[in-house]
Amino acid sequence: MTLPKPTRPKLLLGLDIGSTLIKAVVFDRQGRVLALAKGRVPVRRPQVGWVERDANATWRVAAAVVRRVSEGRAITAVGLTGCGNGAVFVDAHLKPLRQGILSSDQRAEAWVRRDARARQRAYAGQAGSLLRWFRAEEPAAARRLAHILMWKDFVRARLTGVVATDPTDAGAAG
């Protein structure tokens, strides 16, 4: 007679790439919280209206909180959420080309005001508005641009190697 192999519980990992904190939580299938960790990534304001943070530091903090909650656990699914718009401009190797820009950033406001023809008014913190600014203000870096990612999608790409987003973020990119 062969005894069944013991199975480990199937667990779920939630990862929130927020604008102030990065949080990871592990749940069991009944919704009980088994582990929770959080970390902070400093935000920079190098000029009036600019709000940035280091995308590589964001990745390091995200990886650290995931390690803390998942160590010794069998994670079977991962869900990501993030802090709205903004943009992380990366090259083909997912290397950030500059500091990441948070959605509260206003540097592209002049571009938004110039485009009065739009039926849906964009706002300065949307990826589309930020792309216009990036191409005009940092053309050398913009020539190496391969992907414009939302914050959670940058972390997802680093976790999985897959560049993707969801319909809600894509529709709000501007």
Give the ranges of each region predicted by the language model.
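N-terminal glycine/serine-rich phosphate-binding loop of ATP-dependent small-molecule kinases
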Residues: 1-99, 144
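Gly/Ser/Thr-rich active-site cleft segment
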Residues: 17-19, 118-174
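Carbohydrate-associated surface elements
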Residues: 105
